[in-house]
């Protein structure tokens, strides 16, 4: 799934890939680019990003395979956080990024309960075929601040899960420069590993 982007302005387009072609599906609620994302089709989240140069967003949107819903925001707006699939739409990490004025080291952990859009509840009535369908709201999705990474940066790469991940490269500092650092997340802390050759 690909969501958002930039042409001459931020766009809200969303497309899914079926192995041979792209298909346009429901748009995200806020047009933005340089966002973080986790998960895939049919269940994803997109978080942070820019709506125009200098305007940073903190919103998180959740994809259920049909539509996007705004859910819990990041603690602060940022663009260019680690963008790789750090998990699913139910568990993810947001590492680093740029607040619009500086690169940051903050890391936030996303957790969401299992959500059931429709719970089918059958009830037996004498001499009846009645069926009741119930919609249930399951709250509790949230971002929580956890141990910050060691190097402030944005536009970084990443891979892994909530309990085992790598972040690498990116840019940061003043003046902005390439960052060669690679860091490992073990579920509770970040450790710097060998630097990339830039």
Model-derived segments and spans:
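Polar, enzyme-active/binding microenvironments
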Residues: 1-198
């Amino acid at each position: 799934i690909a969501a958002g982007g930039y042409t001459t302005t931020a766009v809200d387009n969303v497309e899914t890939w079926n192995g041979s072609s792209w298909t346009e599906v429901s748009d995200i609620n806020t047009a933005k680019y340089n966002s973080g994302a986790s998960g895939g089709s049919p269940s994803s989240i997109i978080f942070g990003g820019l709506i125009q140069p200098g305007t940073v967003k903190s919103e998180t949107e959740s994809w259920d395979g049909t539509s996007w819903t705004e859910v819990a925001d990041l603690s602060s707006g940022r663009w260019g956080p680690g963008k790789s699939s750090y998990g699913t739409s139910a568990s993810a990490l947001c590492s680093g990024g740029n607040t619009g004025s500086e690169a940051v080291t903050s890391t936030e952990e996303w957790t969401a309960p299992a959500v059931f859009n429709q719970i089918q509840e059958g009830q037996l009535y004498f001499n009846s075929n009645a069926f009741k369908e119930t919609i249930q709201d399951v709250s509790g999705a949230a971002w929580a601040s956890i141990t910050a990474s060691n190097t402030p940066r944005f536009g970084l790469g990443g891979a892994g899960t909530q309990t085992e991940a790598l972040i690498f490269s990116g840019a940061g500092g003043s003046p902005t420069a390439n960052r060669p650092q690679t860091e490992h997340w073990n579920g509770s802390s970040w450790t710097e590993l060998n630097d990339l050759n830039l």
